Amino acid sequence: VTDSVIGEGCVIKNCKIHHSVVGLRSCISEGAIIEDTLLMGADYYAETEADKKLLAENGGIPIGIGKNSHIRKAIIDKNARIGDNVKILNADNVQEAARETDGYFIKGGIVTVIKDALLPSGTVI
């Protein structure tokens, strides 16, 4: 973790975080790289039986950032579920895109993942 602010209650596992703000109860899995990003965090931990059932219905992706995902210059709203090996890099430098049905939009070149969004494993933005 370098040049970053980490909120209370975060679960951070062997990942790299640089020049970012990580909000309350954020979960970041192994191998993830977070750069120049604002993670809003989560409203709750998914630990109850009801939460586990909901998790199974959502494709098994927990709230937070999945393994080996790479996120750069993005805003991740609360309770977002980002799968393993997701790349949010905006490599094509798209300035504007309305993809709310896919769980995100781009304004001014900044990718914003909307609240409660689900980005399946392997997604590339």
UniProtKB/Swiss-Prot annotation:
Gene Ontology annotations for the cellular component aspect, listed alphabetically: amyloplast; chloroplast
Transmembrane segments: none
Subcellular localization(s) per the UniProt record: Plastid, Chloroplast; Plastid, Amyloplast
Domain of life: Eukaryota
Pfam families: LbH_GLGC
Activity: how regulated: Activated by 3'phosphoglycerate, inhibited by orthophosphate. Allosteric regulation.
Pathway: Glycan biosynthesis; starch biosynthesis
PANTHER family per UniProt: GLUCOSE-1-PHOSPHATE ADENYLYLTRANSFERASE LARGE SUBUNIT 1, CHLOROPLASTIC-RELATED, GLUCOSE-1-PHOSPHATE ADENYLYLTRANSFERASE-RELATED
Function text: This protein plays a role in synthesis of starch. It catalyzes the synthesis of the activated glycosyl donor, ADP-glucose from Glc-1-P and ATP.
Subunit structure: Heterotetramer.
Protein name per the record: Glucose-1-phosphate adenylyltransferase small subunit
Gene name tied to this protein: GLG1
